Structures are given as structure tokens and as C-alpha cells.
Amino acid sequence: MSLIPDINSLAKGILSYDRGCLSRGITLIESGLSSDRDKAQLLLNKLLGHTNSALRIAVTGSPGVGKSSLIEKLGLHLTESGNRIAVLSIDPSSPNTGGSIMGDKTRMPQLAHHEDVFIRPSPSGNTQGGVTHATRSAMLLCEAAGYNPIIIETVGTGQGDYGVRHVVDFVLLLVLPHAGDELQGIKRGILEIADLIAVTKADGDMKSKSGIAAKSYQHALGMRTNKLSIPKVLITSAHDNSGISEVWESIQSLETDALHHGHFQQRRQQQIKDAILEATRSLLLSDFNGSEYRSLNDMQQKVVNSKSTVHEAARRLLNEYLQSQK
Amino acid sequence: MNDPLDLLKHFPPIADSDWQNLISKDLSWQTIEGINFQPYYRRGASNLQHLFDQNDWLICAQIQSTEILPALEDGAESLSLLIDQPTTLSKEMPVDKCPLYFRGKAVDTNLFYSLCDIVKSKGLDPSEFQGAVAFPEPIEPDFVFEIAQGTRLWTHEIDLCHWHDKGASLVQEIACAFAQLSDIMAQLKPGTSPNHLYLRIPIGERILLEIARLRALKIGISTILQSYQAPIHCLPFMGVSSLRHKTALDQDTHMIRTTLQYIAAIIGGCNVIVSSQNRNELMIQHILRNEGKLGIVSDAATGSWMIEHLTNALAEAGWALFQQIESLGGLQKARSWIESNIEQTHDQRSQSILSGEENIVGGNIFLADTFQNETPEGKSLIAPLDSIRLRTETIRYKGNLTVQGRCSPWLYRLINLCGLKMDDHQAMITVIETSDGYIARNSNDQQISFNHGAPLNVTAGRLMTLMESHAT
Amino acid sequence: MRPDFSSIPLIRRGITPNIDRSGSNLLRTCDHFDLESCEHLDYSAGLPPFLRGPYPSMYAERPWTIRQYAGFSTAEESNAFYLSAIAAGQCGISVAFDLPTHRGYDSDHSLVHGDVGQAGVAIDSIEDMHILFNHISLADMSVSMTMNGAVLPIMAFFIVAAQESGVMPQQLRGTIQNDILKEFMVRNTYIYPPQPSMRITGDIIQWCTENMPRFNPVSVSGYHMHEAGAPAAMELAYTLANGLEYVRTAIDRGLDIDSFAPRISFFFGIGMNYFIELSKLRAARILWARLIKPFEPKNPKSMALRMHCQTSGYSLTAQDPRNNIARTTLEALSAVCGQTQSLHTNALDEALALPSADTSRIARNTQLILQEETELTRAIDPWGGSYVVEYLTHTLTHHAWSYIQEIESIGGMTKAIASGLPKMRIEEEAAVKQANIDQGKEIIVGINSFQSKSSSEIRLLRVDNREVLANQSKRLSHLKQSRDSSKVEQALEHLRKCASQDNANLLDVALIAAKERATLGEISAALESVFGRYHAQHEPITGVYSATMETDECTVKAQSLSDEFAKLTGRRPRILIAKIGLDGHDRGARVIATAFADLGFDVDIGPLFQTPEDVARQAIENDVHITGISSLAGAHRTLIPELMNIFQRDGRSDIKVVVGGIIPNEDYPLLYHSGVVSIFGPGTVIAEAAQKIINQLLDHVSHP
């Protein structure tokens, strides 16, 4: 366990772009200890004035689609233009063992080496999907440390992909250059939340196929109902380093557009509201879980013996919990 | 994409003549056993002989009685103790831990009975206890079998080391084993089960032949026991390391040989394999079993065209020699005859090693530069060469020698053996090639002459004397 | 009644074997095996499919070549070793290069100071090559060079050095490994990405086919896969599939199959499972002939698989090294019974360091005894016909064939490797094997059974690589002063141009640069500027180690400890597994990573070839509790103290450093002194190491 210096030094360090302090700040945030969480809140408080300063982008897609490769090329492109960028990636923890393997830096070796880049892989832990207040808070710390833009990388399965849109300004969905069957396999939902789609690995034999795939996705997107505009579908290849600057230009124009129409601010405000509610739910849940309930076993038996329904049992439990709060 | 392997479609079977046509030389080979072998055997009439079902063996350590605990900790599964002096067995003998094998000049009925007492005192059933109390020569088979009746102890050893150390070839060892067995069976009351008999066999490093020899023994033993209408048809084998090529001054190299010997012993089907007091040798057995996975398959040589052929050839030759011994009236009567045969083999072997015709790595060629002051192994044919090298060390004088004329490989070997260096500048000895050999001269003008190809140890000895007289 | 034996013949019986199936997966179904149904029983030696040997008379006319692989830090020392080995009975030379050379760096490059001269000879220019072969007539001596990544400059130096000493390319005999596909799969000493690498491979095959008819331009290697954990059938299949890919590359360039196929050679590892390993070699020959036949060769030699074998380094233990003599002996026996053409036997201290003169001698003597004292050189394929060997040959052939078909269905080895399939398969096997060893299911003498109480007294050969570094640097600056720099630059520019177009044979062009005294680093960099340097990306596997360990007590304890730690501190224990320096062997590191994840750690895997700065930065950025450095090649002595200093400098000496791998006992004090908290040698049970680490962390939490 790191010998964490006091919160003041940490905050100062983060503001002066000290990599080690930023890293330890993120550790505090990720910690499951309630004492650490309190400290983390203190830290965030100190830094609040220096946040909300960066563009937040999520890069998501199924395993193997090439997120890290694309992020590396994109990151290098950004650093060439003088940006300091942070990448927060989330790797799934095993529900059985609790452990995880995070190999992202092996997939972005050049970026990991760059002076102006901060890359932090995190395990998803117990939280389903993993993208929660921790990610949001970590992002805020990175902003305070002067990184802009911030890229969140997640695997696009389970609830994580839904969660991530509550935290970023734009979601970039990466897909492989196979149209047809794969298209059916992509969950409806993920297509709904994407702001920009990029076909990856469009090199060599795949060049022609990617054009076709792009068109299929465009078509599928056209059938969405709840978006004001239809996202673009781009074609990229990390191997050939093609399409990368187009991705960044598209993001920038999305940003300009959204700022101009006010959507940008609206979205952020909505996100904050959602985040407050989410945090409240989470507090409630942890409070609930922390106690023991006599009625649980009784009700369980009743349901087993077909004497009661699950819903009735839940009502009973909730009553007991509310009573205990008085 | 499913492309079936279909070997025969792509490659038809090959006829003998196809292969023969590619060979221009005669590649057949002979060993000291005098049998002619081909380099290569193919599928012919069925020669699948599965000769034994046991596939694992007992790891045995030969120890002094003070080393029992360490040996057991090192995983010895049985212990062998040499009793050459009259001994009282300690009550701490680990009869409850593993089989014990006692052998030696001083094994007697006292030892036998005290062993049984110890077994009983530990609450064990003496009829179940496994081990050996091998009575020394001269043995009365009836007597040692009677005393052992009701136990599982082996009391009569057929020791092939006796013939091996005299210089026997594999065929001679096989024949003597058969002959000894026959002599014993002839002396037993009819119908007596020879289940207190075992063979002690020294295993060499000619792997294929050693495996074949063990199997050949099993064939012949089975035949003899059946002929005597014995109720059992096989006997246990205790394999020990052959010391014939033991290079005492190159112990690490000798471990290679020991490994090869154990491999042959395992594959050939020994029931017990004995390691000497060296912990390393025990470990070799563990490695071969656990990592090498030897011993999983019983009689792995079954069906091998080459090894089956060798098995049959050795068995036939051994049988023929055995029949000769029998026709002379049995081993006891034919002893001097067979021993003179063996002596000839010994001389032949010794001569080829001492002249350098046959290479023994670390013994007469590829010698180590430095060595410990070890005692040459008495039973090793390398011993004379080792002694010479030790002599170099004891006079602490590695001198220089120069050669006028060609230095043949044999001469080079001689020089290496003596620990001398070739150096023109400070040579104490000059060797000159002559029409039929060499002359060696020291700076006192003393000289000796020797032939090319003479026994290296003898010549080395003379050369050393020449050098020593230079020193004085 | 004494029977009359003169009239009694030997009584024989022939019964079916009863083979005990315990302990070996492959032997499990032996019982039902009908030997007579085997397709291959009537094949022979010297005729396709060469089951029993690639030549008709095999050892009966000429024994295998004793070829001991060796590299001492400098060309001078290597040369001295070769000369003495030749005098002591060795008949072929095998050159081991150091890691910077493999990866295309000159010895004075800033990234490589810890690795220069360790594990092999540093070759920076043609001058080093001249020294390497001083007094050795390249017209008479067969030279085998293990080089893949920087194969172009090395071949160029070799050819030009030979020419300058009067030996023409046509006369040169030997082998260059030049097997880049397996680098991408397991060994990681590649430089450029797959496509340009394959072009280089093709250029070399073509050039050698046209100019060096006695030289083997590629040695398709299974050894490294074996060491990475591939079982026999997999090693066979993937090696031969790689070979097939090279054949196709050459055919695509318009070469006739018979012009190069007879010169393709193979290199297998030999492990401890005696019968399986020997059968593997026989199966290899059948399979290769079967793979080449469809190309319709007119010369049957095109279908004959010739191989070099090396006894497995992985099977050796650092504990009780004397035991290794027996291991190497058994493995050598296996290779010889399997009819290999040449053989390297490991020295008993090969697991610890470069072999010393004494241990090299024993290693060589193993082969000499096999040649001189066992009569094995009289027999051709002596185990032919044996029930168990023919069963295994049959089974391995078919099993490997199905793996090959799988590769073919993906589109060949290049595509398969890009997909990551072979590497993943191999890693799974490695994790399973480690778990079996850790549980004691698979017994390794001296490691998990029969451990010795005393530590070994072996004198180790130490390389003081600072001296090597200094000498090489001096030599390099001298070279650069005495050559014509404009001509060098011209040659390098020409090389760059030809690399970016597809119109010239790169070896042809490299020869010019070599002649002008361009260095290895300069040639490699010129190519890198066009091709780029490749960074491999591999998905790690999980769940395999823990599944195999099942309910092993040690595992459960480790898992509960990591849960306890998580509860106490709010985070799971987090470890960075890093490889410092140029050593590309990552089997050990990857097995440990997957095992630790299964034990409840959050594991960060670092990329290969990291400097101490890189590793420190990663550790700090990810805020790990522990950094685990995996070291196999000796660079640890310089690089780990550097790492500790950097942690100190950056205020993070609270990050604990542990070291795993091949660390000689003599280095322990140095490492502990620099602040390392634990050293885990080979044979450490992973779950036990995990427990130790967590306990140390827990301690620190309660008493900071």
C-alpha cells in the first residue's frame, strides 16, 4: 500500500502535472475502503475549480476490434499537435477470482513511452461494467492535471458500454470490416449510443470489404429514431495509419456543432444529474447490503414452499430496512 | 479444407531391394560376442515377443548400515547391504520400511535368523517380508531353499558379475547363467519351486545389446525352468552398474554411462536396480522414472525388429554355448573350459582398450585436463590407464616432449595419457619415428623403443620412467 | 532328472503387450491399438517418406554431427572455444549471438548496455566476424548460425568475411536459422513487421539457392515452441506449417522446388518423455514428405527432412545441477534413436549461465559416449517395429496433421500467427504444465521432490559485460574512423531504396554495405527506417492455471490472502510483470501473469524490451504494489539496481521489487543489497510465491 502523502500535497502535485501524484490520486478513488473514499472526496473538492476543462471521448468495441491500436495512432497524432492526453482503460475482472490481466500498454508501446501521455489501466472490479463514479472521478483528476482530451477505453459488452456514455461527451464505436452477419451480432443498444463509428483494420485484403461494411453500418444507423443527427461511419487502419486524422477532425466538428447548438452543455448537465442519482443509488445499495435481515430467510422458505411470491418477499424486506432506519 | 493424410496413397510400401540398391558397402556389424548383425531390420515374419508384464522397478541403494536414513530420505525403495564381516544386525533395521538385501562373504544362518527375529519383533509377518539373504559360495541349493521355505526371501544368488568381472561377453554371461541355473535345478528335489533364486546382472552401456540380453535371459530361463517342470517360469533380476569402463578420474563423465546403464536395465526389465552409495545415482533413477516416463510401458522393446533380432540372436548363441556346457556335464564340470574361453575374451577386450583401438571417453581418449586424486576402479579395464595418470600427478612433474616426424593419433593419445605437453623448446624427451615404431630419448641419452599400437599403459609406464630418470 | 538340453530348443511365445496406461495421456488408448493397421510400417530409410531416416545408411556410414551451440561474449573468446572444441572432437561450429545483435543494435547503442555479451557473442561488424573464424577454414568447417532478426547483416558479414579469406560462397557449408515466423510466435527476437520480414527470408533463400548450394538457408525451428510449452504434436504441426509457408514463399518467387527444398533443414527440441520424443522425430519425417509431395518434386531429396536437435533447456533444473547430466543423456539418447543429423547437448549449468569449459566437456562427452561406446551408430532406426514407438509415431502423425489442417483452414501460418491462435494454444499448455508441476502432479526431481539439502557447488562462468561493452565500443569507433564514410552512406542509401521498392535482393545489396564496413546497427537501422520496428500484441489467457490447480490448498490460501488484502486496503494487490532488457523469452512471464490473475491479483503486463526508466514509469503510472522483473539472460545485474535507483529518485521506493527467473546464487547478495525483497528461482511454486508477496505487503500495511 503506497505511503500516500496528505491530500494537500497530492492536490498540489496533480496541479503541477506530477505523474506520480495523479496516479496515487486515482488509486484513492478506486479504493474500496470508505476511509479512502472520504479522502478521495476531499481531494476532488480541492481540485473542482480545475476540472471541466477537457474533451471526453469513449472508445469502445468488442474484444479484438483494435481499440488499443487505434488509440495509439490517434494519441500519437494528438501529441504531435501538442496535446497532452490521458487514456483510462478498463479491463474486466474475473468474477471468480477477482483478479485481472491488463495488457494495454503492451498494445500501445509507443504511446506509453511518450512524455505527454498518461495511461492508466483499471480493473472493473465488482461493479458491473466497471464504468462508474470511479471512472468519472478519475477523469476529473486527469483534467485537473492538464490532460485534454481524455480517452476512456472499454470493452463493448455488458453494461459497461451503456455506462460509459454517462461520463463522456462522445462515444466512438469501433467495428470490424465484416458486414452482414456481424452486423446482426452487434447489439442494438450499442449502435444507439454511438456518436461516431469507425471501421478498423481496413488494410490489405480488407480494404474493399471495409467500404462495403461502412455502407451497411450507415444504413443500419439510418434506422435509429432517437438521435438528432446520424453519426458518420469512417474507415481507418492503424496498421497503415490511415483515417486517423479524419477521426479527430470528425470529433472536433462534432464538438463544434454540439457547442453551437447547446447540446454539449445539455448533455453534461444531464450526465451530472444522472451521476448524482447513480451515486445516491449506490449509497443506498451499500447501506442496504450492509445490514442483515431476519425476514430474508423466512421469506426465502415461504417462496421455496410456494407460499409466497418473490415480489411479496421483497416488499417485506424493504419494510424491515425502512424500519431499521428510524 | 480437409486433406486426408492417406499415406499409402502418396507413398507405396518399399521393397527390400529398393533400399539395398542404395547401399554400396557392407554395413553388417560384429561385436565381441562374435555374432553378425545387419544395420537394419524390417517387418518380416511376426516377431512380436512380449516377455514380461512388470513395468516398474524397485529403486535400491547400496549402503553401509550407518547410511540407512539418508538413503531412505533420498527415495530409496529398497536397501542393499554388503556383509563381508560377521555382523550382528541392529534391531533398527528398517524392515518395516522397505525390502532389504543382504549379500556378502559373511552372510550365514545367524544373519538369516536374526533378520527373521527383527521382522517378527516389529509385528510383521515373516512370510510376507521381501528381501534377500544371499548365501555365499559354496552353496547347497537344497539347504538354502529349505531354510527359506515359507518366506519370500531370496537366498540363492546367481551372480553374473562373477563372469563379467572375468571378462565374459554377453553370450558367455548368458550361457553361464543358464548353466548355473541348470546345475541348481538339477540338485533340487523335483517339484521344488525355485522361488528363492534371483539373478544379479551387471548392465553395460551397449544399450540395444543390453536390453536384448536381459530379454534373452528371460527366454532361456523360462525354457530351463519349464524343462525342469518347475512351477514358476521366471526369476527376478537385480541390475547393477557395470564397472568395466568406469573412468574413476572422470566421475562426471561416468555418470553418463551410469544413466545409459539404468535405461537399459529399466527397459530390459530388471525388478530391482541398485545404485552405489552416491546420492546422484539414486536421483538418476528417480529422474528416469518420473520425468523420463520409463517404466510406464512393460517390455517397450516388444516388436522392435532390431531388438527382437538381437534378443533372438543372443538367446540362440547363449543357448548353444549352454548346450555345450551341458554336454560336458554341467557348469561345475566344465568350469575351467568356460573360464579359459572367457579369459580369451578378456584379453581381446583389454588389448583393444589399452591400445586405444576401442575408445573409452575420458579413459583413453578425450581425457580431462584436471582430476581428483581418486582410486582407480579395480574392476575397470581403464584402471591401468588411470594409474598411469595418477603417477603423473604424484610426481608433480608435467614435462615437455617433442616429436620428430609425424605425430600419429596413437602417439598423441600416449602423450595425453602421460600428461605431457608437446613443446619443442623445453623438451626433456624427444620421440623419433622409426620404421617399425618409435624411439624415445631423454637428455641423459637414455632411450627406450616401443611399437606403434602397443598397450598404452605399458608404454606410458616406460616413458614415465624415462622421464623420472631425467629428473634425478 | 537332468533334462538332455542338447535336444531342447528355446521355447518362445508371442503374446499381445499389456501396456500400462497410467501417467501418460498419449499412451492411454494404446490397449486398443492394432499395430498391423498402421500405414507406415513398410517404409524405410533413404526413400520417401523417409520414416526411418533421410539417408539410406544413416549412422552406419556416418554418425550424426556433434554440434555444440556456444557464444562467448567476444569474438576472440568464441574463437578460442571453437578451436579447442574442434580439437576435442567436435565437428561443426554453432554460433550464438547476443541479444543486441539479434535485435539489430550495435553494442554501443544506449538501449542495450545491460545485454551486450550476455548469452552470446556481440557482432557489430565484419571485423568481428573475421576474428570469430580466425584459424578456422570455412571451406572445411560447417558453421551453424542462430540468427533471425538481424539475419541480413550477419549473412552479409559471413559471406564477405569468407570471401576476404579466400573462400567463395559456393564452398560455404552450414546453416542460418532464418526462421522469422517462430519469432512472432514464441521467441520475440524479430525486428521488422511480418511482411517485410518474410521478404527478407525469401531473399536469403533465393540468394543461397543461387549462390551457396551447400548451405542451408533456413532452419525451421520447433525447439523454441517446445521450450515455450508446446506438446509434441503441436511442436510438430506448427514447425512443419512454418516450413510449408517458407516453401510457398520460395515457390511464389519462381524457384523450382528441387532447387531449394533439399536445403531446408529443421531444428527440434528434445524433452524428457523418452518414447514420445523419439517417435516425434519419426513422425516429423513422414509429415514433411507428405507436405512436399504435392509440389511434385523430381528429386526425392526435396522431401527428406533433415534435422538438428537440442536437448531441452526447460527440462533442466538450477537446483541440484548434477541431475542434469542424466536428463541430457536421456534426451540425447532419444534424439539419436530418432536419427537426428546433428545434435547439441546442454551443459549441466546451462540453466544458470553460459557453460564453463568443464561442463561443456561433459555435455560433449555425452555425445561422444553415445558414438563410441553404445554401438548405436551401427543401427538404423533401432526402435522401428516396437509396439509403443510405432503406436506413438502413428498417433503423433495423425494428431499433428489435424493441427496442420486447422492452420491451413485459416489460410496458412502467416495468417494464423497474426490471429494469435498458435501462441494462445501454446500458452494454455504451458499454464497447464506449470499448474501440474506446482501441484506436484508432475514430478521434477530436485524441484518438487527429492530436494537436495545442500546448495550446489558449481563454478559459474561470469561475464563481466562492462569490459565487453568497452572493447566493442572501442572497436566500433576505430572502425568508423578507418572506413570511407561516404561509401558507407552510399551503400546504406542504396539499401534503403531497394527496401522500399521490391526490385532487388536485399542480401545482394547488404553485401556491398558489409564490404564497406557498415555496422550491424547501421544496416538494421537503414531497413528499420523503411519497414518500421514491430511491436507484437498478444491477448493474455486467463483461467487455465486456476482450472488446472483446482482445489489445491496452496492456491486456495493464496486466493483468500488476496481477498483479505483487498478487504483491508480497498484494492486488490496489483503487480506489474515486466521484462527488462532485450530478452524476448516471455513464456515464464506470461505463465506467471495468468497464474497471478487467477490468484486474485490485478496484473499489469509490461511490453518486452523495456528499459529501467520504462518499467519505473509504468509501475508508478499504474500505482502497483509490486514490480516483478523476469530475468533470463543476465542483464539483471546492471538493470535492476538501475531500476531501484529510479524508484528512489521518483519517491516511490515503497513499490516492492521481486525478481524471478534464472538468477545464479552469487547474484542474490547484489540484488538484495540494491533493495529487491524476494527472488524466486525456477521451480518456485507460483501460488507459494503469491502468498509470500501478499504476506510481505500485509506486513507493510500494518507496520509501514
PLM feature segments, named:
Chain C
Residues 64, 303-307, 571-574, 650-659:
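Short beta-strand/loop segments at the ligand-binding rim of alpha/beta enzyme cores
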Residues 154-156, 229-237, 271-283, 311-325, ...:
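Short glycine/threonine-rich loop-to-helix capping motif typified by GTGT followed
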Residues 114-118, 182-192, 225-229, 268-273, ...:
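Short beta-alpha connecting loops at secondary-structure transitions
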Residues 6-38, 44, 48, 99, ...:
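Flexible, glycine-rich loop/tail regions that form catalytic "lids" or insertion modules at the edges
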Residues 589-699:
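Cofactor-cradling patches in redox/metallo enzymes
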Residues 259-260, 298-310, 318-351, 355-380, ...:
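Flexible glycine/proline-rich, aromatic-decorated loop/lid segments
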Residues 1-271, 295-298, 303-308, 336, ...:
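Catalytic alpha/beta active-site cores
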Residues 61, 89, 125, 166, ...:
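Conserved, mostly hydrophobic/aromatic
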